[in-house]
Amino acid sequence: TYNNNLIR
């Protein structure tokens, strides 16, 4: 996945 902050 990409940046975890974007997923949240």
UniProtKB/Swiss-Prot annotation:
Keywords: Cell wall, Glycosidase, Hydrolase, Secreted. GO terms for cellular component: extracellular region. The keyword Protein biosynthesis does not apply. It comes from the Eukaryota. GO terms for molecular function: glucan endo-1,3-beta-D-glucosidase activity. Belongs to the glycosyl hydrolase 17 family. This is Glucan endo-1,3-beta-glucosidase. It comes from Pinus halepensis (Aleppo pine).
